[in-house]
Amino acid sequence: MITYEIPCLLGLEKLVADEIKRLGLADVRAENGRVLCQGSWADCARLNINLRCGARVVALLGQFPARSFEELFQGVRAIPWEEFLPREAAFPVKGYSISSQLHSVPACQSIIKKAVVERLKAHYGMEQFPETGTKYQIRFSVFKDQVSIGLDASGEGLYKRGYRAVGVEAPLRETLAAALVTLSRYRGRDPFCDPFCGSGTIPIEAALIAKNRAPGLDRRFDAQKWAFLPAEAWMDAADEAQDREFHGQYDIWGGDIDPRAVDIARDNARKAGVDDCVRFEVADAAQFHRDSTYGQLVTNPPYGERLLERQEAEQLYRAFGKAWRTLPAGWRTLVLSSHTEFERCFGKPADKKRKLYNGMIKCDVFMYGNV
């Protein structure tokens, strides 16, 4: 059995753990900023293709305490790297250190690299390694003097689904958008709306969830090139995911006041294969209105990080709050914002609040209705 580490944004650990449990993996444990689980090498493909809220998939090869560089070196050298890295492999090292004696990340990277090379030298009988072949990204973390080290199976982060327009930076990563939709308990039955849709990330993730479409079907992963991981594992995982897809009629809507953003959102929906069930329109959130008895509203309005922008954001929240109060009582609403005065401006205290991080920005999810 392999131990997998799924890093995630702080606050999303339970959602990621629930996703992994639904995939049937064993010994699922949520910790701060990551979830650990046990599975086979075939599960590496299943995790990468299916996870909506996790940041990446790391196959852990070693966990040990280290308070000195010598302990770090010996711990890394004890791992059977030759079972995973062919002689021509490229094996760069990335990682971080928090609350540990070994606080210098560059020094840790250097020691880890040296230890792996020494292990491979002994096995392959080579003095130098060209690193011209397939990439096997080594990832490590040192947290409170405990080292976790393994191979990054994902490559680019799992938020890169493959549908976002090149060169367009969204304020909300796809993994966090999927988490917000999941928190709203949307399952595809009721109307779903995002009146500040921007490039369409939240409505597109809602459509993928409604269709039960795996988010990783349209991209590549680093581990697909690993010599020890059979290609059939990826084909089987993709087939399994496609067999679970739903085909129905969905009422998913996104609006934005910026026509260019709406054009990008429509293009992204087409690339994601959900343009048949998501409508995007140029619309003013201050005029938002719906008559249906039930529905979900999930949105990420502008925060306004600078003073003038904050004042504009507050005016926007007031206007949106006034429109929102016309919604029928059966609607569930989730608003992600870092603005400390959101509830006052919106005009109603949240029924529930949940702390999340949007990248490095500390935010609250303000929840209204039966959430």
Task: Name the predicted role of every residue range.
Residues 172-290, 305-306, 310-314:
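Conserved S-adenosyl-L-methionine
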Residues 138-154, 366:
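C-terminal edge-of-domain segments
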Residues 8, 256, 337:
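Short beta-strand/turn micro-motifs composed of small residues
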Residues 284-287, 291-371:
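C-terminal catalytic and target-recognition region of SAM-dependent MTase-like enzymes
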Residues 1-134:
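Non-catalytic nucleic-acid substrate-recognition regions in nucleic-acid-modifying enzymes
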Residues 98-101, 157, 302-306:
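A short, flexible beta-alpha/helix-coil linker loop
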Residues 149-185:
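SAM-dependent Rossmann-like transferase core, predominantly class I methyltransferases
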